[in-house]
Amino acid sequence: MSWQTYVDDHLMCDIEGQHLTAAAVIGHDGSVWAQSATFPQFKPEEVAAIIKDFDEPGSLAPTGLHLGGTKYMVIQGEPGAVIRGKKGAGGITVKKTGQALIFGIYDEPLTPGQCNIIVERLGDYLLEQGL
């Protein structure tokens, strides 16, 4: 299965008639493995800061999580495993696997919990596969 299939079928999937706004699978080095057409153009330093927060939990809290120039307020996640951010009625969930970061961006009417389930389910599966 291609990485694009994971994004299209497992991240941008239909949940009660709704779906994520954007999604991507990005390597720890910042390379894009696959992304939805709507995923924001990001800067390498934005991904580097996210990776740093996985290694040093809490490092993003003072500045916020930035992706594609959008700032998200960091909310409770799972240190070293999941980072969650909020902006208005939407937000972002980032799950770290052995080799990649799984990104999900959502907006109302999708809920934070639904985004977490979508992103973390794929991330957990990839971890089980050694990825």
Swiss-Prot record:
Miscellaneous: The variability of the residues taking part of IgE-binding epitopes might be responsible of the difference in cross-reactivity among olive pollen cultivars, and between distantly related pollen species, leading to a variable range of allergy reactions among atopic patients.
Species lineage, top-down?
Answer: Eukaryota, Viridiplantae, Streptophyta, Embryophyta, Tracheophyta
Q: What's this protein's name?
A: Profilin-4
Q: Subunit details for this protein?
A: Occurs in many kinds of cells as a complex with monomeric actin in a 1:1 ratio.
Alphabetized GO MF terms: actin monomer binding
Disulfide bridge partners, by residue number: C13-C115
Return the Gene3D superfamilies for the record. Dynein light chain 2a, cytoplasmic (3.30.450.30)
Q: Which SUPFAM superfamilies match?
A: Profilin (actin-binding protein)
Where does this one sit in the cell?
Cytoplasm, Cytoskeleton
GO-annotated cellular components: cell cortex; cytoskeleton
**SMART domains from the UniProt entry:** PROF
What this chain does, per the record? Binds to actin and affects the structure of the cytoskeleton. At high concentrations, profilin prevents the polymerization of actin, whereas it enhances it at low concentrations.
Q: Where is this motif: Involved in PIP2 interaction?
A: 81-97
Q: How is it modified after translation?
A: Phosphorylated by MAP kinases.
Q: Does the keyword Cytoplasm apply?
A: yes
**Phosphothreonine found at:** T111
- Family (UniProt): Belongs to the profilin family.
PANTHER family reported for this sequence? PROFILIN (PTHR11604), PROFILIN-3 (PTHR11604:SF35)
Which keywords describe this protein according to UniProt? Actin-binding, Allergen, Cytoplasm, Cytoskeleton, Disulfide bond, Phosphoprotein
**In the record, which residues are listed under signal peptide?**
none
